Amino acid sequence: MTLINYKAADQKEVQLRYDWSFSEVESLLQKPLMDLLWDAQRVHRLTNPGYKVQLASLLSVKTGGCEEDCAYCSQSIHNSSDITSYSDFEVEEVLKRAKTAKDAGADRFCMGWAWREIRDGQPFESMLKMVRGVRDLGMEACVTAGMLTDNQALRLAEAGLTAYNHNLDTSPENYDQIITTRTYQERIETLERVRSAGITLCTGGIIGLGESLKDRASLLKVLANMSPHPESVPINALVAVEGTPLQDLPSIDPIEMVRMVATARILMPLSRVRLSAGREQLGDEAQILCFLAGADSIFYGDTLLTTSNPAIQADRELLSKAGVQVNWSLHE
């Protein structure tokens, strides 16, 4: 058993492990809810004693026209979703939106490009300028743009990129049911390139894709056995978009999201566990349970790429109800 002890603020220890077995993860997911929440709470109170929640804002810089065939995604050219593709935002407009997000309380700005991989040339040079500009605002900068080369990863690191997002989406076993134009191994190799360049990883998955509990356990096992653990672990609930192969799938039971968050918190004590897409269908009560279970970041703003998100004022009220600390309350 590989253990690394992390001494928290009150001098108690949290153990970091990178050798979780499938049966251990599956057992956690299946624990009685009260016991699972208790275990997650004990970890979360040690590693985040002030109950701070990071607010991350997400902007789609390049929307639509993606060559990948992800079954859940409205931006794929293989799907018939009714979205409008448009040219990339200019650098100045992106930085203007980043400043607006910061003024609203966000301290992380994430930028997305609907690409299979990063293209060299002017689009990439603009991306680097955006990263530098976001960092100059005093914000964390995250990019999601598909696969990349070693040199591109190094240049993003030199520009000051905080994290690169590249989700695994689902388990290795279920992956071919969701996407066929990129292999699971290619996703892993992309994450390795990012880490080798000195950029932290933002990687997680989606529940509600028709996967089994075993698939969820397998996904979490892959994430939890990365060493070090990802800096951020986004947990998404499927937003079934018309025109995609998964358009008729039902919404998840919100308690399933609570279980995923709690298990991720136990497995990866120091990672940010981010409530991502699908929050609107959870309701306030389930989201507050997710904060209790260990979620310490949300995507904040009215839109996530091409799907809706709770309004800023609604999120302010939610976070106030939950009694957590956020960026604006820390500086008031």
From Swiss-Prot:
It holds the Pfam family BATS. Its EC number is 2.8.1.6. [4Fe-4S] cluster binds at C66, C70, C73. [2Fe-2S] cluster binds at C110, C142, C202, R274. Its cofactor is [4Fe-4S] cluster; [2Fe-2S] cluster. CDD domains: Radical_SAM. Residues 51-279 form the Radical SAM core domain. InterPro entries: Aldolase_TIM, BATS_dom, Biotin_synth/BioAB, Biotin_synthase, Elp3/MiaA/NifB-like_rSAM, rSAM. GO terms for molecular function: 2 iron, 2 sulfur cluster binding; 4 iron, 4 sulfur cluster binding; biotin synthase activity; iron ion binding. It catalyses: (4R,5S)-dethiobiotin + (sulfur carrier)-SH + 2 reduced [2Fe-2S]-[ferredoxin] + 2 S-adenosyl-L-methionine = (sulfur carrier)-H + biotin + 2 5'-deoxyadenosine + 2 L-methionine + 2 oxidized [2Fe-2S]-[ferredoxin]. It is an enzyme of class 2 (transferase). It comes from the Bacteria. NCBIfam families: bioB. HAMAP family: BioB. Belongs to the radical SAM superfamily. Biotin synthase family. Homodimer. This is Biotin synthase.
